[in-house]
Amino acid sequence: MTIENVLPEDYAEMLKVWENSVRATHGFITEEDIEFFKPIIMEHAFPAVSLKCVKNESGSIVGFVGVHDAKVEMLFVLNEVRGQGVGTVLLQHAIEQLAATKIDVNEQNPQAVGFYQHMGFKIESRSPIDDMGKPFPILHMTL
């Protein structure tokens, strides 16, 4: 698997990866929440982070990671390739090449919490709401 740089013209494809991943792993998020977050991600979140992606043999993005100030701000993988090492490769790259040492993860996504713990992250603290004030508890984790 090769890590590639992301260009702004990749954002629409990445948003599809985000939505696919969220629908598969974030059962607590409603359709209204997904539609609320889409423009925020496209217009604010993607441009604010250093983005890297993994593509499949046909050149389609199957996962991506975004890092800012040593924090993994986003890591999403297409549900169809979960468990195939894409997330591991992206997170290792974020740690080794982008100096990532922190991540916030939805407490209601136990698969992600377990993945980050397996990768060496430990829970430091918990917030009862997310950054947007929504009732999604967040675990603050560090290496």
Could you describe each region identified by the protein language model?
Residues 96-108:
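Conserved GNAT acetyl-CoA-binding A-motif
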Residues 1-9:
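Conserved N-terminal entry element of GNAT/NAT acetyltransferase domains
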Residues 83-96, 114, 118:
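Conserved acetyl-CoA-binding loop-helix of GNAT-fold acetyltransferases
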Residues 11, 16-43:
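Conserved GNAT-fold acetyl-CoA-binding loop/helix
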Residues 72-82, 106:
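A short, internal acetyl-CoA/4′-phosphopantetheine-binding micro-motif in the GNAT/acyltransferase core
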Residues 50-63:
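Conserved beta-hairpin
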Residues 117-126:
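Conserved acetyl-CoA-binding loop of GNAT-fold acetyltransferases
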Residues 42-53, 71:
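A short helix-loop-beta-strand connector motif used in the catalytic cores of GNAT acetyltransferases and
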